[in-house]
A protein has these predicted regions:
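Transmembrane alpha-helical segments in multi-pass inner-membrane proteins
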Residues: 18, 58-70, 191-201, 205-271
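Membrane-interfacial amphipathic/re-entrant helices at transmembrane-helix boundaries
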Residues: 1-21, 49, 61-64, 90-94, ...
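Cytosolic-side transmembrane-helix boundaries in multi-pass membrane proteins
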Residues: 82, 113, 174-188, 260-293
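Helix-loop-helix "hairpin" substructures at the membrane interface of multi-pass membrane proteins
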Residues: 14, 136-215, 239, 244-245
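Transmembrane helix-bundle core of multi-pass membrane transporters
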Residues: 87, 92-162, 189, 255, ...
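Hydrophobic core segments of alpha-helical transmembrane domains in multi-pass membrane transport
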Residues: 47-52, 68-75, 102-108, 146-157, ...
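Membrane-embedded helix boundary and interhelical linker motif in transport proteins
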Residues: 9, 31-78, 82, 87, ...
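Alpha-helical transmembrane segments within multi-pass membrane transporters and channels
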Residues: 58-102, 109, 244-249, 280-281
Length: 293
């Protein structure tokens, strides 16, 4: 029983990472109905920015988190302005293909400059372990992940619900043209949404580096897809849904490994996506919306 509880703790730590990345997917889709498949590579960029901050600039983990957050936010704005804004009036297929192209560009550019091999993430943070009860324990890295994730989720909910920019984001999500007629800077809102989602992905990248002590230029592919599954599971476009979906995927992966089927954990996640699209296409918190074509 205690071993099972320990796996649940581990699953919540992994799920926190998926939740942070899934929030970026769901915010962008909720605002402009775009699946930003380059988002996983922004997460990878965040990990390498954190690596540079810790290894070269000799910063501590907390400062590295802030640096990754700011740089990835700027990167998100650049990607939106250069790659997506010119295609805003184009078909969704064109935007989707562009997103895949941006993903390949970031991944291959990083592989060219830094190589495709894994790099050890230098962090001595969180080596201490705290016993909860019996043989169930939590380490400093997991506490960092839980603390940062909960704080960011609370901050995000506050921004979306109670700030002027958050209200503008919700208005653009409902009707972009009506929001523009009401005087809302739609371009600014969309850029802010990309910046916010990219900042969360950058922080997730640093947290993964701290947790697993290794990063690579291809790390964004699988994790990005799983975070997308989490967003779909929770109901893409729903912020609470992305949070719940991330934790559910993390727990599912951990339980699959716990029962001895670790080689199949990725397949189980993708099979879950298949089932969701058939049984519950709107996700757990999504709404079925009819569109006229």
């Amino acid at each position: 029983m205690e071993l099972l509880v320990q796996q649940l703790v581990n699953g919540l730590a992994v799920g926190s990472i998926y939740a942070l990345i899934a929030l970026g997917y769901t915010m962008v889709y909720g605002t402009i109905k775009l699946i930003n498949f380059a988002h996983g590579d922004v997460y990878m960029m965040g990990a390498f920015i954190g690596y540079f901050a810790v290894m070269v600039l000799k910063m501590n983990v907390f400062v590295a988190l802030l640096v990754a957050m700011v740089v990835c936010a700027v990167l998100g704005i650049v990607i939106e302005r250069v790659a997506y804004k010119p295609l805003r009036k184009s078909t969704r297929v064109a935007a989707l293909i562009t997103a895949i192209g941006v993903s390949y560009l970031l991944e291959n550019a990083m592989s060219y400059f830094f190589g495709a091999e894994s790099r050890p993430f230098p962090s001595d943070f969180g080596t201490e372990t705290f016993t909860l009860f019996g043989d169930v324990s939590v380490n400093g890295k997991q506490i960092l992940i839980f603390g940062v994730t909960v704080a960011l989720m609370a901050l995000l909910q506050f921004i979306v619900r109670y700030t002027k920019m958050g209200k503008a984001m919700r208005a653009v999500a409902v009707d972009e043209q009506a929001a523009q007629l009401m005087g809302i800077d739609v371009d600014g809102v969309i850029s802010f949404t990309f910046a916010l989602g990219s900042a969360l992905a950058g922080i997730a990248g640093v947290l993964v580096g701290v947790y697993y002590n290794t990063i690579s230029t291809t790390m964004g592919i699988t994790v990005g897809l799983k975070a997308f599954v989490a967003a779909v599971l929770g109901g893409i476009g729903s912020i609470p849904g992305a949070m719940v979906g991330g934790y559910l995927i993390g727990l599912l992966e951990t339980m699959v490994s716990f029962f001895g089927y670790s080689p199949y954990r990725d397949g189980v996640v993708y099979f879950l996506l298949f089932i969701i699209l058939i049984v519950l296409p709107a996700g757990l918190f999504g709404k079925n919306v009819r569109e006229k074509v």
